[in-house]
Amino acid sequence: QTVFPGRDVCCTGFGWPFLGWEIEGSNEYVWTHLPAKKWNALAVVRPTWVAEQVESLLSHPGVIGVKPYYSLIGHDASSRDKYIEASIFDFLPHHQLEVLNDHKAWVTMHVPKADRLGHPENQREIKEIRNMYPDIKLVIAHFGRSYTKPHAEEGILPLADDPGLYWDNSAVLNPEVHALAMEHIGPDRIMYGTDNPMFMMRGRRKWEVRSYTNHTSQDFYFNTNRESPEIEAGYTLY
C-alpha cells in the first residue's frame, strides 16, 4: 500500500540460477512455499533438460514459467561469466521454447554478452523468439542490463515497439534509462523488480558514459574501491 496504493500486487520469485546451488531443491522450495503467499513462481531451468522435464516443471501449481541463465551452461567457481558470450539458445534451447510456447509460459530473460542487449546477436535472437514463439510471455530483465544510457539506446530502442515484449526494471538505478524506457516502452509493459536479495544491501551506483561502479558498505568481492566512512554512512538501500 505504500509503493502501489490502491492496486493489487502479486510478487514473482525463483531460486538462485547458478550451478553452485541445488537447482532442483530450490525449484521445489518455490513451488511449495510461494503459492501459500499467493505469489507466482518461476522454475530455474537447466539447458540440458529435455522437453518432458520442462513440462513437469510447469505442471506444479503456481509455476507460471521459467528462469534460464547462461551460467547454467557449466559451473565455474571462479566466475559466473564464463559463458557470458553464449547464444541465448545455448541456455534456452528450442525444444524448451516449444514447450513454453505451448503453455503460454513466462520467461524472464537475463541477456548474455558483454555488450548487453544491444549486441546484434541478442537483438536477432530476441526477435527470433518473438516470431517463432509468440505465445511466450518474454520479459527482458534489467531493461536488458541497460545500466547506462548508451546501453539503453542500443538495446531498448530497436525492440521498444514490439507490443508483446515485456521488461523489468530491477537493478536499474539510472534515471536517464528509466526516462528513456517510459518514453519509448511506456508503463504498461514495464514491471517493477527488486532483484532481492541482491539489492537488500546498502550502497549507491556511479556511472560514466558506458561504465558503472557499484559501491556498498558490505564486504563483497567486487567492493574493492571503498568510499569514506562518512559517505558510506549515508548509503540507502539499492
Residue ranges of each PLM-predicted region?
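Glycine-enriched alpha-helix->loop->beta-strand junction motifs that scaffold or abut catalytic
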Residues: 60-65, 102-106, 132-137, 158-166, ...
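Active-site gating/metal-coordination segments in enzymes
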Residues: 10, 18-115, 166
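H/E-rich (His + Asp/Glu) clusters that bind or coordinate divalent metals
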Residues: 141-238
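Catalytic domains of carbohydrate-active enzymes, especially glycoside hydrolases
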Residues: 1-15
